[in-house]
């Protein structure tokens, strides 16, 4: 079976749900429920391409200037499409790989956003406009990031909570549902949303101290307060 046929099979098989960044493919007895409301994290920072690239120079110095440019463009594009703050997307990339393009997990997740090959095949078939059919996971970091944002959006629609979607990205949706069913989510899974939020807060602070980005001072105050950040507006 060719790679493209395999991807088409995954897309057409309604029972398949692809697990998160560090998990396997799971077979579900029934499809996950879709949350019947719009989930949106309205960005409060207004970033230009140049500002995002300048930030990437500070937080990801190992990336080439060309890669920073391509990554910044992709993050702005997908964040705007999904209604996310681009700093949230960068926070996920930072936690997943530390911006190391060749990062590989023990379970086979690869790249900047640690996508499993099965996840990559499934979401690239589901989102053909990204062009993932021409690649395998890890071959083009920008394609990986674009597909990861769309995969996360898919998780958020089904779990209805930003924190739950983050945990599902880390553990896999089926496994997270099993943990929640018995009310025994491992601490390492619970910690994942907090790690993303810490990176988000750090990036907001870097922006506020380095450049007059619209909304950065307000966002920094929110991030440093006791109120949760990166919540879903209902």
PLM region spans:
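Compositionally biased regions
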Residues: 14, 226-227
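Iron-associated oxidoreductase/ferritin-like identity signal
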Residues: 6-8, 23, 211
């Amino acid at each position: 079976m060719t790679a493209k046929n395999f991807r088409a099979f995954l897309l057409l098989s309604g029972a398949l749900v692809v697990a998160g960044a560090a998990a396997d493919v799971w077979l579900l007895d029934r499809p996950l429920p879709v949350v019947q409301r719009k989930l949106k994290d309205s960005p409060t920072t207004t970033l230009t391409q140049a500002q995002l690239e300048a930030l990437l120079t500070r937080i990801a110095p190992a990336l080439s200037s060309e890669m920073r440019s391509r990554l910044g463009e992709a993050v702005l594009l997908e964040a705007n499409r999904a209604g996310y703050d681009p700093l949230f997307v960068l926070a996920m990339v930072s936690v997943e790989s530390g911006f190391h393009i060749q990062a590989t997990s023990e379970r086979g997740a690869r790249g900047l956003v640690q996508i499993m090959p099965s996840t990559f095949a499934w979401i690239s078939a589901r989102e053909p406009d990204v062009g993932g059919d021409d690649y395998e996971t890890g071959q083009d970091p920008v394609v990986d990031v674009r597909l990861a944002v769309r995969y996360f959006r898919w998780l958020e629609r089904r779990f209805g909570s930003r924190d739950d979607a983050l945990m599902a990205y880390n553990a896999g949706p089926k496994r997270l549902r099993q943990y929640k069913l018995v009310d025994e989510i491992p601490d390492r899974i619970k910690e994942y949303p907090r790690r993303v939020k810490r990176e988000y807060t750090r990036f907001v602070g870097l922006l506020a101290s380095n450049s007059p980005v619209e909304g950065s001072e307000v966002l920094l105050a929110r991030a440093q307060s006791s109120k949760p950040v990166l919540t879903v507006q209902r």
